[in-house]
Amino acid sequence: MDLKLDDFLYDLPEDRIAKHPPKNREDSKLLLYNKGNISHQSFKDIVTAIPVDSLLVFNNTKVIPARIILHKDSGARIEIFLLEPVQPSKVHEEVMNSKGSCQWECMIGNAKKWKIGSSLTLDSISLQAIRISTNIVEFQWKDDLTFSDLLTEIGKIPLPPYINREVEKEDQDRYQTVYSKEKGAVAAPTAGLHFTDEIIGKIKAKGTSVDYLTLHVSAGTFQPIKAEKISDHPMHNEQIWIDRTTIENLLKREKTIAVGTTAMRTLESLYWYGAKLVGGNNEFFITKEDPYQLELVTLEESLKAILEFMDQSGKNRIGGQTEIFIYPGYDFKICDGLITNYHLPGSTLILLVAAFVGEDWKKIYEEALSNNYRFLSYGDSSLLMK
């Protein structure tokens, strides 16, 4: 399929980009799309809108204060944006609990003012940041603090670039989901920002199953597509974790609804991991080409292969990496529904939505624009059912 980026663009006026969250999490509009039909409700109505026989899957990653501002003796301001952990481990949980030192791959603002091999210090907490190479920074500090504690002291929440304002007090709470747990994301899984504990409780009370997995959202989620051929776009690599119970529940499911594009990408990656296992490959790394090249197996074969592998290796939780790229032509293996906000024109997330609902994505976005929906991370919501 020859896809052109121009086919996934739309006009997004600046004043439609939500710069702040609504007063209450659930005070959002909800567009319902079901097999071509569109209706408009309030997000509070999500409880009745979700089919009872569904499994609702959330991404429980927690946004870390990934922006660190330091100054040289000359006064030059250097901003360090944490991307991925490097040492002592590439596993977020282990690095966040490390004491004394760690290394991260970073984006560095005003990098020309900070020479490789030199260090910056923050005396108030005895922090030293050493630029090891172009984009690797080593942090050293007193080992009575974990790196997580350190970030709480000095880091700032990394709001998306299109919000285009300084972090405010409300963002500490509102740019996290109420169920966030596993520290490691540098962007929020924003479809979940609308949910409250009360709404999740009501969903469970009506008999709908709820489950969690983890994808640590990377800064690559904001990377614009520049490649002439869409499939040539270099997809970002993200760390994912799934519990045995979640896989077992997927086997029992009637319908699976992903809360957000990150949950959807994790679920679909899980299927392809099972397909790899059936084919004799146990490396949990899903490349962007895998879904378009691997031999197909049934969903049951895939999930059972994963459970069997977990039995053999004595694991109740599996982790891997995914750079899955979902665009029109992709055949969904696990997801029957998607709860999601409204995304940037020409982004990989628009392509994912277009893959899920087809050409109707344009109708959905036109409806949202003409009904004064708020767009992007702090914007309104939609429930899309196939």
Each model region followed by its residue ranges:
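Surface-exposed, charge/polar-rich loops and edge strands
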Residues: M1-K386
